[in-house]
Amino acid sequence: MAVNWVDINVDGETMEGYLTQPAASGRHPAVVVIQEIWGVNSHIQSVTDRLPSQGYVGLAPALFHREGRMTLGLYEEMDTALARLGRCSDANILADVRAAVAYLKAQPNVDPQRIGIVGFCFGGRVSYQSVCNIPDLKAGVVFYGGRILQPLGGPGPAPVEQSAALSAPLLGLFGEEDGNPSPADVARIADELNRHHKTYEFHMYPGCGHGFHCDGRASYRHEAAKDAWAKTIAWFNTHLKG
């Protein structure tokens, strides 16, 4: 496996990205990995590191690049992370994801027709929003995406209000004890997807709260995380390799 930090052009600005690649030659499917509010920290890097062994190129773009490099891995810095999130906008986030997808499409070892996205927490929201706005994405996975029901950095629309435009199969993985998104939020999102006849699967994990996949958080639940990751790879295998 090859690992690098790369520079990605976003409208003339530089966004860092954590890139992992299989050792095998040829063109591979690729997955954009979207951070939690703490940036491309050790957890997000470890997720991206898992992809090459499954035959995928992985790329985790640093979405807070407009504010400079963020200290990585300090989960106690909630106020700092939330302040940065509050200064984000949906327009900038979509520009960043489009740039990450364009970067992958330009790589000689990536099949440009087989790119997916997975996101965690804030990144789950970004993943949902992205598959509603970027047709180049052929599969999406949302891990406990908060604030899907609200716009960010402007009057709207919220990601859930863009569900009619969702253009890729979507997998959602949620904790039954989570408050953001709550089970009621997840049900509302599912209702909207059903209303528009979209292809999706949602799984609710009993006894799990927010962040159950992240082994750096007290909310980590090993068995649920293991099962959710297996479902993630199976989803990508079906929709990016099938």
Regions found by a protein language model. Give the residues of each.
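N-terminal cap/leader regions of alpha/beta-hydrolase-fold enzymes
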Residues: 1-242
